[in-house]
Curated annotation (Swiss-Prot):
GO terms for cellular component: organelle inner membrane; plasma membrane; plasma membrane light-harvesting complex. Keywords: Antenna complex, Bacteriochlorophyll, Cell inner membrane, Cell membrane, Chlorophyll, Chromophore, Light-harvesting polypeptide, Magnesium, Membrane, Metal-binding, Transmembrane, Transmembrane helix. This is Light-harvesting polypeptide B-885 alpha-1 chain. It comes from Rhodocyclus tenuis. Belongs to the antenna complex alpha subunit family. It is a single-pass type II membrane protein. Residues 38-72 are periplasmic. GO terms for biological process: photosynthesis, light reaction. Residues 1-16 are cytoplasmic. A bacteriochlorophyll binds at H33. Signal peptide: none annotated. It is found in: Cell inner membrane. The core complex is formed by different alpha and beta chains, binding bacteriochlorophyll molecules, and arranged most probably in tetrameric structures disposed around the reaction center. The non-pigmented gamma chains may constitute additional components. One of its GO terms (molecular function) is bacteriochlorophyll binding.
């Protein structure tokens, strides 16, 4: 019954429950973040690296080599 819910804290230590809850939430948050980082769509760290590499490779292929005095 609702009026007797306070008796639960006579059985369980409130500090232990709060520390356990905080530890579980921290582990859960890390797990969710690492799962998201492992996906292609939701990885916010490597965003745009493939596009930047492709652009750099295309620009390197288009850019002509400098003409030196020995080549003339």
């Amino acid at each position: 019954s609702a009026p007797a819910q306070w008796k639960l804290w006579l059985v369980m230590d409130p500090r232990t429950v709060m520390i356990g809850t905080a530890a579980w939430l921290g582990v859960l948050a890390l797990l969710i973040h690492f799962l998201l980082l492992g996906t292609e769509r939701f990885n916010w760290i490597d965003t745009g690296l493939k596009e930047q590499k492709a652009t750099a490779a295309a620009q390197a292929a288009i850019t002509p080599a400098p003409v030196t005095a020995a080549a003339k």
